[in-house]
Design a protein with these regions (language model features):
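Conserved nucleotide-sugar donor-binding
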Residues: 3-5
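C-terminal cap/loop subdomain of S1 sulfatases and analogous C-terminal strand-loop tails that border
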Residues: 7-12, 16, 21-103, 107, ...
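Residues within well-ordered alpha-helical secondary structure of globular protein domains
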Residues: 29, 52, 120, 130-134
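Active-site-proximal N-terminal segment of extracellular/periplasmic enzymes that hydrolyze or transfer
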Residues: 115-123
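Short amphipathic alpha-helical coupling segments at ligand-binding clamshell hinges
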Residues: 124-128
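Charge-dense polyanion-binding interfaces
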Residues: 129-143
C-alpha cells in the first residue's frame, strides 16, 4: 500500500511481483543513485510502478521458504522445492510425506495454492528448477 499525492493515482493497483528486498533499489532510485553491483543482489526498483508504468519489474523471485524449502516465482508460476508447508503449518499438523517431491502452482488460476500441478507440468518444473539453480549458483537475481 502506497500513497504519493500527484504521483500515485488513488485507487490504483498492480499485479506486478515485488519483494521487501526491492525497497533498497527503489530508495536508491528515488534519490538518483545507482546501486553498486555488489549491493542488493536481489533488489529491483519498483519506482516505475509507483509512477504509473505497468512494466515487469523483476523476472523472478527466489525465497527461502523454511526448513530446506525454496520458493521460486516466475510469471504465473510458483515452484516450491519440497513437500508440505516448509514449517508454516499450524502446530500439531502432520508433515505430508505422500505425493510429489515438490509443488507447482499457477497463481493466476489458483492464488490460494490448492491445486498442486507438479506432476502435470514436468517441463515447467524443469524450467523453473533450472532458473532457481542459476540463482543459487550466482547468489543473485539482479544481473
Amino acid at each position: 500500500i502506497a500513497s504519493w499525492p500527484t504521483t500515485i493515482a488513488p485507487g490504483t493497483s498492480s499485479d506486478q511481483t515485488i519483494s521487501f528486498c526491492d525497497l533498497l533499489a527503489t530508495f536508491a532510485d528515488l534519490v538518483g543513485t545507482e546501486l553498486p553491483h555488489d549491493a542488493g543482489p536481489d533488489s529491483f526498483s519498483f519506482l516505475p510502478l509507483l509512477c504509473g508504468e505497468d512494466k515487469e519489474i523483476r523476472p523472478s523471485l527466489a525465497v527461502e521458504a523454511g526448513k530446506n524449502h525454496m520458493s521460486f516465482r516466475s510469471g504465473d508460476w510458483k515452484l516450491i522445492t519440497g513437500k508440505g508447508s516448509g514449517g508454516f503449518s499450524q502446530r500439531g499438523q502432520p508433515i505430508r510425506t505422500a505425493g510429489p517431491d515438490g509443488q507447482l502452482y499457477n497463481l493466476v488460476e489458483d492464488i490460494r495454492e490448492q491445486n498442486n500441478l507438479y506432476d502435470k507440468h514436468p517441463e515447467i518444473v524443469q524450467h523453473l528448477t533450472t532458473m532457481l539453480e542459476k540463482v543459487k549458483e550466482t547468489g543473485r537475481t539482479r544481473e
